[in-house]
From Swiss-Prot:
Record-given protein name: Transcription factor Sox-8
InterPro entries: HMG_box_dom, HMG_box_dom_sf, Sox_N, SOX_TF
Binding region for DNA: 100-168
Ranges of compositional bias, category Basic and acidic residues: 1-12, 155-169, 209-218, 232-243
A single Gene Ontology CC term: nucleus
Gene3D superfamilies: High mobility group box domain
Transmembrane segments: none
Any one GO BP annotation for this protein: neural crest cell development
Motif 9aaTAD, residue range(s) on this chain: 415-423
Major site of localization recorded for this protein: nucleus
Region described as Disordered: spans on this chain: 1-57, 155-243, 291-375, 442-462
Name of the encoding gene: sox8
Its job: May play a role in central nervous system, limb and facial development. May be involved in male sex determination. Binds the consensus motif 5'-[AT][AT]CAA[AT]G-3'.
Taxonomic lineage: Eukaryota, Metazoa, Chordata, Craniata, Vertebrata
Subcellular location per the Swiss-Prot or TrEMBL entry: Nucleus
Amino acid sequence: MLKMTEEHDKCVSDQPCSPSGTNSSMSQDESDSDAPSSPTGSDGQGSLLTSLGRKVDSEDDERFPACIRDAVSQVLKGYDWSLVPMPVRGNGSLKNKPHVKRPMNAFMVWAQAARRKLADQYPHLHNAELSKTLGKLWRLLSESEKRPFVDEAERLRIQHKKDHPDYKYQPRRRKNVKPGQSDSDSGAELAHHMYKAEPGMGGMGGITDAHHHAEHAGQPHGPPTPPTTPKTDLHHGAKQDLKHEGRRLIDSSRQNIDFSNVDISELSTDVISNMETFDVHEFDQYLPLNGHTSSSSSLPSDQPPAPVSSYASSYGHAGVNGPAWSRKGAMPSSSPSSGEVGQHRLHIKTEQLSPSHYSEHSHRSPPHSDYGSYSSPACVTSATSAASVPFSGSQCDYSDIQSSNYYNPYSSYSSSLYQYPYFHSSRRPYGSPILNSLSMAPAHSPTGSGWDQPVYTTLSRP
């Protein structure tokens, strides 16, 4: 069909070739374009078009010169017209019935009559402008002036009811929104909920209550998880793509820090760790188990335990008094370990940028002596700093929460060996590491003094 119309257009533009003017070829073109709209099947359409082609040939004998006829037949000969798809509009079965229009209302009666009259008088008027003017005029009409149009509309309605007793108005359905678009909308809405929930976290007491309640009820009060990820993710058979999607959403929500309460010096580690966290587990999936152990030996041996001491501080702290939590820079330098912790922070701040260091941290099992030396003093300092530094919700130590992502001594194990769920923080919303640490802390430290040594000896690498 398309090539036929192209040929005809060529004929139209080629005035010397076509002896009988444009109108004849145009009418032929119109008859061609109208033909496929008849609701026949593809076979019927093929036969219809072949008969049409014969008719075209017989008519073209007089209408077009021999050069054009030969060119057209040459083009049409090699084309299988049964392959041309029928234009399907809506339901094929409904197309067999003629479309019944709704009866006109009073305004339509007025507008149609007035438009005909005006179009005859002022043919240069644009249709849209005409419609606007007719609408304005209709609003200015009084009830008595509208009466004849209202009566006519009523008569048409009654007539329509007689003609089509079982008529039901079926407006055209809008096409469904593209799936990608709806997903992004729900994602944006979800992120909006997360951002909205974050500044209102208030004091730590509220967090502990809410998260304990969420732990028991299974319906979180914190930022909602994405609708696709499972609610309780302790079984790690979840699909990888869902996990990554959820993690990206959550990580993007973590970046919304209340900058009025955060020291600028702390910001670099927080932002960097938040930006790059989801890469770590992707490295863990694709790298061999001991991929970086050889190169990790060149790292300073005292570097990794800094996050562990911050773990110990937060967990011991939660055991001692929940409602207050210390900021990073607020630990008093009363014990030597807190100063060293600060130095280690600086080390990590410089090294965090390269992803290979992430994997080196995560594949490496630190020396056990460090745990013994760092866990209990850090708890003491955190307990003292708890009294001195009250906690405000947005000062939550993001990099401590994150540290299970970029520094995880047990990531070389299979995920079923992870005993405690706060090592899976990448699969949960950012509040849940706090949640799990608060609820699980008594398991580690019944007295609230620190982490038990056997946890590390049992889980360290053989």
